[in-house]
Regions:
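Loop/turn-rich, solvent-exposed surfaces of beta-rich toroidal or solenoidal domains
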Residues: 206-208, 222-261
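Asp-box/WD-like beta-propeller blade repeats and closely related beta-sheet repeat scaffolds
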Residues: 47-118
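Conserved blade-ending motifs and adjacent loop-strand segments that build the rim/top face
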Residues: 186-188, 223-233, 260-284, 320-328
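Repeated scaffold domains used in trafficking and secretory/extracellular systems
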Residues: 7-9, 53-58, 96-103, 143-148, ...
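Blade-loop segments of beta-propeller domains
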Residues: 2-9, 23-68
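Blade-level signature of beta-propeller repeat domains, shared across WD40, Kelch, NHL, RCC1
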Residues: 278-335
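Hydrophobic beta-strand positions that form the internal "hydrophobic ladder"
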Residues: 19, 65-66, 110-111, 155-156, ...
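A flexible loop/linker signature enriched in serine peptidases of the S9 family
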Residues: 4, 23-33, 70-75, 92-96, ...
């Protein structure tokens, strides 16, 4: 079973030359995950890790390092050379906690990972200095999930519950200060909007929209509507969104936020069921020229890359009288 990193995290190296994925050795709940890399065109596949306890992978925003936890110890691996290195031990009285991905600050100074507090088994956010000098607990929550570092350096976000037991998304600074509830309750599968302070996501339940919101706003701004958008990856300049769809599954949609128009890029043929590995979870390469997604179209989840032609993007970004209400364009026909 193989998949790329989630919509919130980079799966390509900063120079866009290399794709990094994770692969489970056998399809079993407790089976180990290994990290692999290949060229952006799918060639030169190589294995980067083979430890049974590796988890919570994160790719650096700049350079060629990937970070991961073994238990509560931080490790790094060079995507180019395969060199692995133990970086920093974990904080005391914290147990391991495995999740999909960790995350790294865009300047590369910090890695944020998961653990569980020994005293009450609550999930904790661990911040490691990547120079190996410190590992500290920043926050705790009984339902900790979805650690995500803002590509613009505006802090990190994570999922949890409030005092009433309701699911919420929190934000805080890299040092753990300014813990607050983010205004993302109406956004499904949200992410930071590139390097900006805004957030972008699909509509909740019956709302067939992609919309954005910023801290301090009461209401979100609808970008496009019409398809049942599901997960939204976004370009670092926050001009483009790539979204998968469901009910029905219409494939990947490319959205230009400025023009408020969208069109289908490709079909994904994933089953889009309850298991996470049946979801496409699309994301862009840093240059926006490729979209990476996961599909179980063969019966087992694998990673796919779709080129996003510049001509196609120019067409989507140009106001078009043929766009339907809500911004959907007809199928693209390259000349």
């Amino acid at each position: 079973m193989s998949n790329h990193f989630y919509i919130e995290h980079p799966s390509f190296t900063s120079d866009c030359s290399t794709l990094v994925i994770r692969s489970q050795r056998v399809p079993a709940r407790a089976a180990p995950w290994d990290l692999y890399a290949c060229d952006a065109d799918g060639l030169n596949l190589r294995q980067l890790t083979d430890e049974d306890d590796a988890n919570n992978f994160a790719l650096a925003h700049e350079g060629s390092l990937a970070w991961y936890q073994r238990g509560t110890t931080l490790w790094s691996v060079d995507v180019g050379t395969g060199e692995r290195r133990e970086v920093c031990g974990g904080p005391p009285d914290v147990l391991p906690m495995g999740y999909w991905c960790g995350c790294a600050s865009p300047d590369g100074k910090f890695y944020f990972g998961y653990g569980r507090r020994r005293s009450d088994d609550q999930g904790v956010v661990i911040r490691y200095r990547t120079d190996g000098t410190e590992a500290v607990v920043l926050a705790a929550d009984p339902h900790l999930c979805h650690l995500h570092a803002s590509p613009g350096g505006h802090g990190i976000s994570f999922g949890g519950v409030n005092e009433r037991g309701e699911g919420v998304q929190y934000g805080m600074n890299h040092d753990g200060t300014n813990l607050r509830v983010l205004p993302t309750a109406t956004l499904s599968h949200f992410t930071w909007a590139g390097t900006t302070k805004r957030f972008v996501g699909a509509g909740m339940w019956e709302r067939r929209v992609i919309h954005t919101i910023e801290e301090g706003q009461r209401d979100s701004s609808v970008v496009v509507e019409g398809s049942f958008f599901w997960h939204t990856g976004i370009s670092w300049d926050a001009e483009w969104t790539v979204a998968d769809t469901n009910w029905p599954n219409e494939g990947l949609m490319i959205v230009n936020i400025r023009a408020r128009q969208y069109a289908r890029l490709c079909l994904t043929d994933n089953t889009a069921g309850h298991p996470q590995w049946t979801h496409a979870h699309p994301a862009f390469s840093p240059d926006g020229r490729r979209a990476v997604y996961t599909s179980d179209r063969t019966g087992m989840c694998q990673v796919y890359v779709a080129d996003v032609p510049e001509e196609f993007k120019a067409w989507v970004a140009t106001p078009n009288p043929d766009a339907a209400p809500g911004g959907r364009l007809p199928e693209w026909r390259p000349e």
